[in-house]
Amino acid sequence: MLAKRFEDILHKLGMAGLEHPLFYHAPVGIRFEIGGEEPIYLDRRAAKLKTNPAYVQGALDRAAAIYRALPAVPDLLRIDGYPDEEPAESLLTVIRQRMGLPVPDEQLPAIELDEDGDTHAQVQFYWDLSGITFQPEQLLQEIILGDIGGWSGFVSSVYLTGPGPFLYHLYDDRGLDVLGSSRELLLPLYHQFHGWILEYNLEQIDRVFTADQPQRRKFTIDGRRFSSMAGF
């Protein structure tokens, strides 16, 4: 069962279950900033806000670059829906139309407990990506648009996992969490995309990934953040 496989992956990531924000509930993870410097909307004074295509493309470029650099190609997709807001059949219709996905391999009703201790009906849809044609950039773009003119059902509800294991969670246009079963698994991502790590969490993430390594020296050029090993 894909649901059982997903649960096993969470345990291997050191998590008892899915609890948001995911980054703060996993021993090893990286939180990336996805939204760039471009304004989100073209004209905030307009009666109807219009999303800035340059902002969307910049966020998509970052999310897709990190996706392509994952330790392996994701082979399991989970999307959560909330039938209190829309019937499960309607949710699935919207998901399939927007993502170009087939009927899910598994569909599981569940109960979600939120941060306030309240319960909500949930339905979990699972796809085995190894057996279907999958367009990851279409998925990523729909998530990015979720809070800024798209369908909000994709916000904080889409999870991709793969061998390692790892979990890739683009939660909205602002950020992305990648969790791993070990520091070594995510070390290439840490080095390659260090300049995109969310500054608020940078010190914490640096401590995890440089625990047994020479101290990194941080510097800024033209507003962009860089780092190098001390002594070089």
Task: Give the ranges of each region predicted by the language model.
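Extended, low-hydrophobicity segments enriched in charged/polar residues
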Residues: 1-150
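Alpha-helical oligomerization segments
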Residues: 158-232
